[in-house]
Amino acid sequence: MQLQSYDPGNFYDELFFAPGQPRPQAAPLIDWMGQLSPEILRQHHETAQIALFNLGVTFRVYNDDQGVERIFPVDIIPRIIAEAEWRSLEKGLKQRIKALNCFLTDIYGPQNIVKDGIVPLDIVESASGFLKPCIGIKPPAGVWCHITGTDLVRDGAGKWFVLEDNLRVPSGISYVLENRRVMKSTFPDMFQTIPIQPVDSYPSQLLETLLNLAPPHLAAPVVVVLTPGINNSAYFEHSFLAQQMGVELVEGRDLVVADGYLQMRTTKGLQRVDVVYRRLDDDFIDPEVFRPDSLLGVPGLMEVYRQGRVALANAPGTGVADDKVIYAYVPEMINYYLKEEPLLANVPTYLCWREEDRNYVLDHLAELVVKSANEAGGYGMLMGPSASPQERAQFAERIRHNPRNYIAQPVLNLSRVPTLIGDQVEGRHVDLRPYILNRGDEIYVHPGGLTRVALRKGSLVVNSSQGGGSKDTWVLQGSTQ
């Protein structure tokens, strides 16, 4: 097929140095796929989409007027990462999670990082994810962020950057597992000849992480996955993970606080619950503490949690670290808490609450990406170079009105991966979301992660809600380049 003649252009390409020159880790794949005709590859691609549909791999877009569930399309040309490069990323991700966990322990405790002038108090307290009811809480094993999805990008020079931290309720791991399942059934020969690290252990790794949180001296801790319900955009994933771990999927109405413990309603009566993997935002967890109008949570849950009678993952309050203004301080957190230099760099970031930064951003909106501090999914964002003058003017007014709520970053020349578009192979921009499990005494980074791809030509927005797709991510075993 056309992979041999694929032109990576003036971008860092994950599979090719130049036309006809694959990177060492990609050479076996390119040779193998080169034997397939465009028609056969297209058939395989369509088969993969049908398989995802039959598996029910869907997501729901909140602003979709029709409320239709959509398939998250997978492109069948994978992204490949050499083992040595992956080990380097692993080290940087573990370092970052350690520092963020120290930060959460600190700001809900002595707030030394504030007292020492590293992070301003008003920045912490004005973050929508900072929850005063969590001050003084000591989560099991001192771990706040048990499950994290960290978004990484690579620039035109091949350097990795952290784009975003997702600690509150990171999603997407189900796509990683189901994409691999579909790829293995579509191309079984490739998985027999190319040494690809497996990914199917994630549910057991997650269950082990959750069981480690249970109160001590319990012979058989009960774990549940708490979902907002079937209308949530990631409901497929909630159901999938519960089924894969062999635990109950519950909604708030299935749980009740009774006799000082969290209990689950069953056909045989109430059953004590010891660990909750919660997939709803902090505000909805407990109407007695947070939003009083929440019908999704459990009244009294936070009091049971404070008493150490149930564990919650992730811990309430972790959302403060998702704030994109807080993100800008993570390199300083690494210096402050770990006495180390960051192994993974942040994207250079302008903080609009600073007058000098704000003036620069307002003068250079056409060159920058502007992001709202607490929105996700590609929403609340301005792509300056492609925005209209009217859109830039509207964003400028928003920045002036609430500068604390906005950051800006240069437009990175994101790396690309060959992607099947119609009957042609074209380069498309990608990011990478690895998944990290923090058990306190051990941090586990799942091999690969979710590669999201911007399917629209020239687009840098990879989010599923904005028309993006995904790719299987191969971390090779024994590769050094």
Curated annotation (Swiss-Prot):
Protein name per the record: Uncharacterized protein sll0335
Residue ranges of the TM segments: none
Domain of life: Bacteria
UniProt xrefs under InterPro entries: ATP-dep_Glu-Cys_Ligase-2, CP_ATPgrasp_2, UCP005522
Pfam families found in the cross-reference section: CP_ATPgrasp_2
Family: To M.tuberculosis RV2411c.
